[in-house]
Amino acid sequence: MAGDVEIAHLDLADLAGVRKFADSVDRVDVLINNAGVLGLPLTRTADGFEAHMGTNYLGHFALTCLLGDKIKDRAISVVSASYALSRLHIDDLNWHNRKYSKWAAYGESKLAIMLFSCELARRGVRTYMTDPGATDTDITRDTTGLLPWVREHTFRRFPAHSAATGAQSTIQAVTTDLPSGSYLAPRFNQWGKPKVTRLRKKARDPAMARRLWELSVELTGCDWQNSDAG
């Protein structure tokens, strides 16, 4: 398959850069929200957001909304099974008033983007969520503490997917027409071929999703854009 590749700079941890990037784009057939950080100590983005929430969710929220109906086919978000162990603290999304946990911060950011994806589907946007499972990537490259050691020794015993294998759920979401809001995850939680998987109620909660959307608009200054709007 032949094609052209064009590379552009985009830092989802900086909303000014997100706006500049979105303004430069005329059309998107398929948007894949795949940026991610994991296991960072308490860090703030350029806009003051906690780094996991700011990068993994709020940056993607802003980008998706600013592109708006320039997205012609579908929007896909790469998520994580860690959402199942998470609880979204909607009144303290950016960890100003509670003891920080980098693992909880990551899980909450993934739960947030799943709620956002479900709300997009309710608003008529074709959207899917994909989970790569246990995949050997550099997402933990900036992690401190025990995780690098645990990761190395765990993957010796239980081999992780290659990045190419981990991408299969996303490729399936790009190339297959499924009901909007579908969640594709490995058959055996972290391993196995991707299949459509039922979301837990916490990721499908319409009231929480609406609250999160409204708060995200307030925090980012971005809302869904219609290109025909004056």
Model-derived features with residue positions:
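C-terminal segments of enzyme domains that contribute to small-molecule binding surfaces
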Residues: 200-225
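Rossmann-fold NAD(P)H-dependent dehydrogenase/reductase core
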Residues: 1-143, 218-230
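A short C-terminal helix-loop "cap" of Rossmann-like NAD(P)-dependent dehydrogenase/epimerase domains
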Residues: 96, 146-155
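Short acidic, glycine/proline-rich loop/turn micro-motifs
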Residues: 44, 194-200
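Short, flexible, mixed-charge acidic loops at enzyme active sites
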Residues: 88-94, 142-147, 184-193
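Pocket-edge positions in alpha/beta enzyme catalytic cores
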Residues: 10, 158, 201-204
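C-terminal helical subdomain
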Residues: 109, 153-196, 206-210, 214
